[in-house]
């Protein structure tokens, strides 16, 4: 019964009233990206855009995007929940409501949002609900948090296009990706920033469906 209750708490979204309260103080994070030396929090050059993408464990997802041409800088953190300035330990309880996400700062003149969304949908399984592979809990849900109305509309169209591709491929499951405007992003602890650059042999749970996302 204890294990069932624990799993249920991890896979059920809390309400604002039941979520952990958190704290006023933000977590300490480095000023610059471990790989490319660019500022994690800005300021960023004019013309860049930002989107927040959740693909399960953020370690592998962040590496995927910092290696993508046109992505200027990345950072990992928590979004989509209620707890203020949550810690990693708090998010893993499922009692903050947050998802692990990657902040992707990109140059749309080099890589389009469609290009990023293609990577997003192809490189994880967006049909798994409150889990990603062996990682179970609300924090590992698939999510897209937009910073503009245009991003929001494109994300919804990309989801619909990929759902059609999954159906045609006989995948048989509905996309569960949460899509909405970003409300608040909280940076994760220093330890998690660019984790797989600091720990090259570390865990990466990214697994796609094998279905192509053909969006223009």
From Swiss-Prot:
Keywords: Oxidoreductase. It comes from the Bacteria. InterPro entries: Met_Sox_Rdtase_MsrA_dom, Met_Sox_Rdtase_MsrA_sf, MsrA_MetSO_reductase. GO terms for biological process: cellular response to oxidative stress; protein modification process. It is an enzyme of class 1 (oxidoreductase). GO terms for cellular component: cytoplasm. It catalyses: L-methionyl-[protein] + [thioredoxin]-disulfide + H2O = L-methionyl-(S)-S-oxide-[protein] + [thioredoxin]-dithiol; [thioredoxin]-disulfide + L-methionine + H2O = L-methionine (S)-S-oxide + [thioredoxin]-dithiol. The keyword Amino-acid biosynthesis does not apply. GO terms for molecular function: L-methionine-(S)-S-oxide reductase activity; peptide-methionine (S)-S-oxide reductase activity. Has an important function as a repair enzyme for proteins that have been inactivated by oxidation. Catalyzes the reversible oxidation-reduction of methionine sulfoxide in proteins to methionine. Belongs to the MsrA Met sulfoxide reductase family. This is Peptide methionine sulfoxide reductase MsrA. The gene is msrA.
